[in-house]
Swiss-Prot record:
Documented EC number(s): 3.1.3.2
Binding partners and assembly: Homotetramer.
Cofactor mode of binding and number, as noted: Binds 1 Mg(2+) ion per subunit.
Protein name stated in the entry: Class B acid phosphatase
Binding site for Mg(2+): 70, 72, 191
Signal peptide positions on this chain: 1-22
Enzyme's top EC category: hydrolase
Family stated for the protein in its record: Belongs to the class B bacterial acid phosphatase family.
Molecular function, one GO term: metal ion binding
Record organism: Marinomonas sp. (strain MWYL1)
Gene3D superfamilies in UniProt: HAD superfamily/HAD-like (3.40.50.1000)
Function comment: Dephosphorylates several organic phosphate monoesters. Also has a phosphotransferase activity catalyzing the transfer of low-energy phosphate groups from organic phosphate monoesters to free hydroxyl groups of various organic compounds.
Length: 236
């Protein structure tokens, strides 16, 4: 009986923690393909694939504006941070995602173990060359420190750095939408379904960055599931 109760408690804790760190679910309008699908079977013809050069060409002659970036699996490959957090705070479980001690570790130093994604380097360099304003909006729980802001500023050589916006997450609302709208962001780059919907709800374009196939954040999203444009070779 005690074993059964412990098992039920563990399952409920995992469900609760996952629910606390996920967006609402919006049904897709297209088939969509995960990064794993696209790596093994090639680029599907029914997904709108674009490159950084394509975006740069589209924006020629347009005045500078604000663009936004998600952090985890979009700007940084941060699986090492989350894997370490799970091992330390809730081995084989997900309750660490509701533990402020984990977020303080992640936000106040462990991000140094995150790897910058090449696609983020290319996008940020292109937008800065245009004079666009760069914002980082994450679904993470915030901490009383400025490490992630400084790390991103140094890693991507941000000229006019804004503090990272910690929007948190919710199962009942898209928490990033108001920040995208309030900062008049026109393009928001993200790997999650919620990033695409948040951008659209704010009147911006959400462009999909492919989540790496070996990310600890599973299941891997279906790229193109909302008919959004997807960046080529953006899984790394």
């Amino acid at each position: 009986m005690n074993h059964t109760l412990r098992s039920i408690t563990l399952v409920l804790a995992c469900v609760a923690s996952l629910s606390a760190n996920a967006d609402p679910k919006t049904p897709g309008t297209h088939k969509g393909y995960s990064t794993i699908d696209m790596t093994t079977a090639g680029m599907p013809a029914d997904v709108k694939m674009i490159s950084v050069a394509d975006i740069q060409k589209e924006l020629q002659g347009k005045a500078p504006f604000a663009v936004g970036f998600d952090i985890d699996d979009t700007t940084l490959f941060s699986t090492p941070v989350f894997y370490r957090g799970q091992q330390e705070f809730s081995p084989n479980g997900y309750s660490y995602l509701t533990n402020q001690d984990f977020w303080d570790k992640a936000n106040c130093g462990w991000d140094a173990f995150s790897m910058p994604k090449n696609i983020a380097k290319e996008l940020i360099a292109m937008h800065q060359e245009r004079g666009d304003s760069i914002y980082f909006i994450t679904g993470r729980t915030g901490s009383d420190c400025n490490f992630t802001t400084e790390y991103l500023k140094k890693t991507f050589d941000i000229k006019d750095m804004h503090d990272v916006i910690f929007a948190g997450s919710s199962r009942t609302e898209y928490t990033k939408t108001k920040y995208i709208k309030n900062n008049d962001i026109k393009i928001y780059y993200g790997d999650a379904d919620g990033d695409i919907i948040s951008a659209r709800d704010a009147g911006a374009e959400g462009i999909r960055v492919m989540r790496a196939a070996n990310s600890s954040y599973t299941p891997i999203p279906k790229n193109g599931i909302y008919g959004e444009r997807v960046l080529k070779d953006s899984q790394y």
